[in-house]
Amino acid sequence: MGLMRETFREEDHVRLHNVIRKAGDVINSVPDEAVIETKVRAASLEAIRATQEKIDRAYDGATYAFGGKIKREPLKGYIPVIHRGADEVMKESVELLDATYRCSRPSDFNNACTDVGDLTHLFPVLNFTFGGFAGKLHGADFRITDEELAYIKPAKLLALTIYHLLRDQAKEAKKICREFKPVFNKESYCQYIRDNFSENE
């Protein structure tokens, strides 16, 4: 699997993470059962599928090599986020708050995983972040450094954006929904889960 990484394309941003959950019950003995969890992250569903196929072949080959058996239990992970630029109504709201901002670009790839990725395949989602803190996200040194910037301005931004979306009988909100082209609807999303995350022997 280490050598397999050489086949990944840079633009796919593939990441593999292995965790050995069980490796036998006694020392100095070949285990009767070993359990490993492999996590795949990538920039698209296609890249995840292609990587998963390579991983499956690697495990199949290793299992065949020592005459063992393999049982797979696919686990559902987050789907990659589809980039969507800031709507004019949000930009208008930021400017009313006299705040500075930078619009993200598709090239600003973030390897973090979030359930927002699933939502972007179904709805017009705008994922934004804000300041007012220091340290590593989810880290022991994370701390709030500016309460106005961390709490108050984001709340005002959301309230103003909602107002701008709903004014004039929700004209802007309806326009965004009308122009959005989802990857899945509810039924096809559920079918994707069933097709890709059922047990395989």
Task: Enumerate the language-model features and the residues they cover.
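Surface-exposed helix-capping loop/turn segments at secondary-structure junctions
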Residues: 8-12, 66-70, 101-102, 166-174
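Charged catalytic carboxylate motif
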Residues: 54, 89, 153, 157
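Zn-dependent metallopeptidase/amidohydrolase metal-coordination segment
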Residues: 103-201
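Short, flexible segments with low predicted structural confidence
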Residues: 90-92, 129-130
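Sequence-level detector for tyrosine residue identity
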Residues: 35, 59, 64, 78, ...
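Midchain, well-structured core segments that form catalytic/ion-binding scaffolds
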Residues: 1-88, 94, 107-117
